[in-house]
Amino acid sequence: MSDPFEALKAEVDLLGRLLGEAIRKVSGERFFALVEEVRLLSKARRQGDGAAAEVLSQRVERMPVEEMEALVRAFTHYFHLVNLAEERHRVRVNRLRTEGETLENPRPEGFLALAKALKERGLSLEEAEAHLNRLALLLTFTAHPTETRRRTLRHHLERLQEELEGGDRERLLARVVLLYATEEVRKARPSVEDEIKGGLYYLPTTLWRAIPKVVEGLEAALERVYGKRPHLRSPVRFRSWMGGDRDGNPYVTPEVTAFAGRYAREVAKGRYLEELEALVRDLSLSEARIPVPKEVREGGEGVERFPGEPYRRYFAALYRALEGEALSTEGLARALKVAEKGLEGVGLAQVAQAFLRPLEARLSAFGLELAPLDLREESGKLLEAAAELLRLGGVHPDFLALSPEEKEALLTEELKTARPLLPVGEVPQGEALRVALGALRAWGDKGAHVVSMTHHPADLLAVFLLAREVGLYRPGKPLPFDVVPLFETLEDLERAPEVLRRLLANPVFRAHAQGRGGVEVMIGYSDSNKDAGFLMANLALYQAQEALHAVGEAQGIPVFFFHGRGTSTARGGGPAGRAIAGLPPKSVGHRLRLTEQGEALADRYAHPDLAVRHLEQLLYHFAQAALGDGVEPKAHWREALGEAGERSMARYRALLSQEGFFPFFEAFTPIREIGELPIASRPVYRHGRVRDIRDLRAIPWVMAWTQVRLLLPGWYGLSALEGLPMPLLREMYREWPFFATTLESAAMALAKADLGIAERYLKLVPEGLQGFYHHLAEEYRRTVALLEAIFEAPLLHNQKTLERQIALRNPYVDPINFVQVELLARYRAPGGREDEGVRRALLLSLLGVAAGLRNAG
């Protein structure tokens, strides 16, 4: 097999030349010469030419802002094209590896490898089928500022992908010209409606095509290993937070929540109608040729067209029912099963497999909702809403003044009755109650209600009280949706087992959990990292899962985990399959939830084949973890890592609390500018307060460090491991998947960081604060040396593709950083914030670095 990376480089070269021609056509020869000059200087700097950096810096300092904006746009478009070429490269490599696998030598982390592992573990085909059909991998799509591409750009990139297949150079050039001449910056901050439409984009497109391939791939793999084909439904389902996540986002109103559910249902309905229309066209089976079951005949009786073609009539009737909103997910699933059995009963199983099974797979993955919507609200807002409701109902005048225990007791007593509290005709004056009740009424109750910043059982019982008010709760019965505590900070993670113990002892919540078949618990990777630092956050999350699982086991109620991961290393990013392998043994039940957000959506789902491979890797690890497989950590590993974690957290917190660090952070990084420019709908600071780092949201905290190429949240504090013996560290790395995953995630962040670029931002920092940077640079070097000693190899020793990708991209990200430093200086100068040209160019630079690094926050 020829080196696929050579094909990637050839395609990158082609697209680069086409972009050069587009720049000439749209912006002229003089500007093209400038782009080339900057590109060559950047390349020379990378190759060790020290003078090139200063020449480039001086060149940028003299540029008019219009030229800077155009330069950033040019290099950002290069990344869009490189990302496209990389996606195509990964598709080619995936196909080659799949074609080359054999039963004796299956592809790592693939369906065939999974089927073999299940058989080697002693599962019969029936047991393997039952196990896989029980699995529920829920992928939850969330909107975040890291997905920086407009839908118009996505459209051009998708068409470009098709034109690359055709190989017509003139059409390729025309498409690249269109791409280059398209405005990529939003004129205003995106609305939540924009985020909903953009965030759901991949569900009815690439994932719609991918899901049947996932089910087909699993079934075919089991058939190869066991000799008989099973009947599987999709183990993958989807959820959405877009339009339901009200935590700190004042723009998510009840009207937006209603729009989100309605939009997703309309999109799904359109796709299902297309599928049914295709079945009407395709299933032209004549009743004169084959026997037809009674149910199929009767199902199509109301249709006058297609005499003698009962299957066409049957699916035409289903089309009409769905169009008229007279069909549920369950009803459509039953109807498809009737048709499938009818075909199989007359020896036409192949027809059912080819034409009906793909639709059944989609229905089991998406339902008619496409991605049921979750609600998320902060506990304080829910308690505030409950307090007004209790006051208006004459139950208690000042609920918020009660202790947590008193709140729980009062709510438990109140929830024994079914009476609503709001007097007839009374309109709530408080915004918290009005919004909470409005959202519950607007919501389709198909997802879950997540309570962020959960501290006490009363935080969740408030949801029951509010749900009762809109007719969703009856005493002693479970709610029709999960109520999910979210534990985020280190303190909350440590307190989580006790909170869960008290929840499961509470009669209201226990009856609910039993009725729902278990309790879902969400753990947050973002705030815990910002709170405790990288190493301690990872350790605390691991320990919390062990303890929460033990509480559920002791109470006889399953605990299912919802992992609130981001795309960056600091927020639990990295290869998601390996992360599942690193979870505590026995903590993974048959249901697992993960967030999917930011540019992870484009990275994983831009092409159906990439989507299939990503889901294949997740399912490979999830299916085995759900059987209780995993490495139980040795006692001395726990002790050693516990001590190192404490030291790491102490160092991290000492840095953040040191006088002058917050002013250094605001000067060194573009954090203020991220908040001021139209990147995302959610405010950067919680509650609008700006006192210190605690008021800052986790995503912009990570994004700011990524922009300056230091990626501090993804590695800082790891040098605390230096206190442990090297043989012990190497043993833990070799034998403990959790520890290996943690270190390899940090290695990714360290490899993407660049001190040479980070140092350019020092010109923005007052001299008295520059010592912070020198400390961080020294910590960076120490941490790299430590990890390479543990690995006994370079940082990316087992991630060669990523290593080559970084080398390919860096010379083109660097110029954007050079420009960004100068733009920040101009923006912060008197009058700079009013300069629209500087604002636009700066926003473009933020988006450009995000496009170049691919996991901005």
UniProtKB/Swiss-Prot annotation:
Reaction catalyzed: oxaloacetate + phosphate = phosphoenolpyruvate + hydrogencarbonate
PROSITE patterns in the cross-refs: PEPCASE_1, PEPCASE_2
A Pfam family per the record: PEPcase
SUPFAM superfamilies assigned: Phosphoenolpyruvate/pyruvate domain (SSF51621)
One GO cellular component term: cytosol
Post-translational modification: The N-terminus is blocked.
GO BP: any one term: carbon fixation
Keyword tags: Carbon dioxide fixation, Lyase, Magnesium
InterPro entries: PEP_COase (IPR021135), PEP_COase_bac/pln-type (IPR022805), PEP_COase_Lys_AS (IPR018129), PEPCASE_His_AS (IPR033129), Pyrv/PenolPyrv_kinase-like_dom (IPR015813)
Temperature impact on function: Thermostable. Retains almost full activity after 10 minutes at 65 degrees Celsius.
A GO molecular-function descriptor: phosphoenolpyruvate carboxylase activity
Cofactor (UniProt): Mg(2+)
E.C. number(s) listed in UniProt: 4.1.1.31
Top-rank taxon, per record: Bacteria
Active site location: 144, 530
Free-text function comment from the UniProt entry: Forms oxaloacetate, a four-carbon dicarboxylic acid source for the tricarboxylic acid cycle.
Family affiliation: Belongs to the PEPCase type 1 family.
Quaternary data: Homotetramer.
HAMAP family per the UniProt record, alphabetical: PEPcase_type1 (MF_00595)
Name of the protein in question: Phosphoenolpyruvate carboxylase
Gene that encodes the chain: ppc
